[in-house]
Amino acid sequence: MSKTIATENAPAAIGPYVQGVDLGSMVITSGQIPVDPKTGAVAEDVSAQARQSLENVKAIVEAAGLKVGDIVKTTVFVKDLNDFATVNATYEAFFTEHNATFPARSCVEVARLPKDVKIEIEAIAVRR
C-alpha cells in the first residue's frame, strides 16, 4: 500500500504527479527542480540550484518521517556536465552537514529540464 507525500516545504508538482510516495519501507521522491517553495524563485547559480534541489528532496523525505541519512540512492540530472565539479562540491557539503553517508548516485547530462533550470535531483530513502 502506498501513501502520497505532500508538503508545503517543497514545490508543488508542476504536472500530473506527486512530490513523493511512501511505500512503507521505502520513500521515493519525484525529481526536484530548484524552485524555492516559499517564493517560486529559481537562483541563477548552479551551486545554489543544486542546494535548493537537495533542500526540496530533504523536505519530502522529512515529510515522510525520515532524514537525509536515510537516503540510499539519488539521480542527478544536469543540463551541462561542465558543472559536475560545482554540483559535486555542493552535494558533498549537503550530505556532510547532515552527518549522512553518501548514497549511491547516478549523474547524467540532459538536453533540457522543466523551467529551463540547470539541475534536477530525485531520491530513494529507506525506513530502517
Curated annotation (Swiss-Prot):
Annotated effect of mutating E120K: Deaminase activity is defective. At pH 8, moderately reduces the increase in rate of 2-ketobutyrate formation over the rate of IlvA alone
A Gene Ontology BP annotation from the UniProt entry: isoleucine biosynthetic process
Annotated PROSITE patterns: UPF0076
Entries under Pfam families matching the protein: Ribonuc_L-PSP
UniProt GO MF annotations: 2-iminobutanoate deaminase activity; 2-iminopropanoate deaminase activity; deaminase activity
Known pathway: Amino-acid biosynthesis; L-isoleucine biosynthesis; 2-oxobutanoate from L-threonine
Reactions the enzyme catalyzes: 2-iminobutanoate + H2O = 2-oxobutanoate + NH4(+); 2-iminopropanoate + H2O = pyruvate + NH4(+)
Disruption phenotype: Cells lacking this gene appear to be compromised in their ability to synthesize isoleucine. Mutation results in the partial block of at least one step in isoleucine biosynthesis subsequent to the reaction catalyzed by threonine deaminase (IlvA). Mutation is required for the dependence of the PurF-independent alternative pyrimidine biosynthesis (APB) pathway of thiamine upon the oxidative pentose phosphate pathway.
SUPFAM superfamilies: YjgF-like (SSF55298)
Highest taxon in the source lineage: Bacteria
EC number: 3.5.99.10
Protein's name according to its UniProt entry: 2-iminobutanoate/2-iminopropanoate deaminase
Organism in which the protein naturally occurs: Salmonella typhimurium (strain LT2 / SGSC1412 / ATCC 700720)
